[in-house]
Amino acid sequence: MYKHRYFHFFFFFFFFLVSTKIIRSFTFLNNNTNLSNPVYFKKKANMVYDLIVIGGGSGGMAAARRAARHNAKVALVEKSRLGGTCVNVGCVPKKIMFNAASVHDILENSRHYGFDTKFSFNLPLLVERRDKYIQRLNNIYRQNLSKDKVDLYEGTASFLSENRILIKGTKDNNNKDNGPLNEEILEGRNILIAVGNKPVFPPVKGIENTISSDEFFNIKESKKIGIVGSGYIAVELINVIKRLGIDSYIFARGNRILRKFDESVINVLENDMKKNNINIVTFADVVEIKKVSDKNLSIHLSDGRIYEHFDHVIYCVGRSPDTENLNLEKLNVETNNNYIVVDENQRTSVNNIYAVGDCCMVKKSKEIEDLNLLKLYNEETYLNKKENVTEDIFYNVQLTPVAINAGRLLADRLFLKKTRKTNYKLIPTVIFSHPPIGTIGLSEEAAIQIYGKENVKIYESKFTNLFFSVYDIEPELKEKTYLKLVCVGKDELIKGLHIIGLNADEIVQGFAVALKMNATKKDFDETIPIHPTAAEEFLTLQPWMK
């Protein structure tokens, strides 16, 4: 009798638990569809946060979540969508478009591998699916903050003092649609600025007729696009645009694109772009963007050249820190061209205020870098050059993994008393062009300038990747892979590694570890390569300079 009672009790209890979980699941799914809508928090009475983070991009999110996991009381303020530039208008949508362009290349050339492929492309469908994925990431970011017990405030922040900020534009859940926007004042022992950056528009006549790289992702139809700028964002976008069937022009102010990258690598890229009918206009000093009619723009250069009939003109001439509304001047926070100046601990000129990510620049310490390694070649020459440098030198690395690393390590230092800092040297970089570029360390030109030509040895190779070997086209039209090692001193310390070609974006990551561990050419020579791969060429290179 009692056994039956216990059985019924446990049965109904189990049924209740399962039912509750199912209901919660449906509630979550229902709520999840609206997670992109704002969720507002009312400040808790007398709350003093251990850390207030201004900005919900990669660096801000990383710092906030890590600090919360260290049991700190954390608030995060964001005026737009969570995820920052990277998730919303940068790395993520860009890589999806890069993937689409790569799929195009494979489909277009599949006949060389025996496939009879006919295809069409639906840009609006790709945009829809891409944006759904980004919205999903926005929602995941919001869930992660909730899971880590980070209080999220949505609005625009500005400083009232070194410990207090004003948030404009927040609403609580009981006043979401009616009444004036609330203002909230938060107090924190430490404040982190991670506001990222925004596109720059120069004072050019007709600039209002253009869009930025951010708005590029809103384009669903176009026949002809011009991009003004020659940095990595411009180069990545123009390569995508052409492969999506759009007539493409890129306008470079100087004699070549990507001037800060190794010249030999960029020469290979420019040749590939020209073979794919991407128009590279050099020495292009734009003086006017004229609107002839709707979706009919012309680009006018200072030397009289005119390029016509563009549906869209995209300006990619740089980005600037999004700091002007923070009221930094009230606290005398040191800035340099609007970038917040921080030390190697990410601390600003105000003791309890920090900055990470694209909005800041890190002042290098004064000690001689790599002094033990410099003895491999000509230390005296290098020291003399250093003595002639009187101005401050800064790191300004605008990359998502750098911001994430800096944010997490800052939280560790603040709340676990750890000492590790972000290492801004030898940061691997990839340009998602077609073909992609991977690079670590110094270019050949920079190495010669620092160490002297007599102390630099170059190893390089150019070849046709096996993937393209079966293409039924002229050999000179087949895509090439080019790679280079920049070595310094008698022990041939590798100070730079560069590659352009198929899968370069994946190849370069592992070599970054080797360079960080001070690998030499001998280390590469003594490593057994994997065959047949493009990466094996790094381990079998022969010098052109004896």
From Swiss-Prot:
Disulfide bonds join 86-91. Its cofactor is FAD. One of its GO terms (molecular function) is flavin adenine dinucleotide binding. Keywords: Apicoplast, Cytoplasm, Disulfide bond, FAD, Flavoprotein, NADP, Oxidoreductase, Plastid, Redox-active center, Transit peptide. Pfam families: Pyr_redox_2, Pyr_redox_dim. Homodimer. This is Glutathione reductase. It comes from Plasmodium falciparum (isolate 3D7).
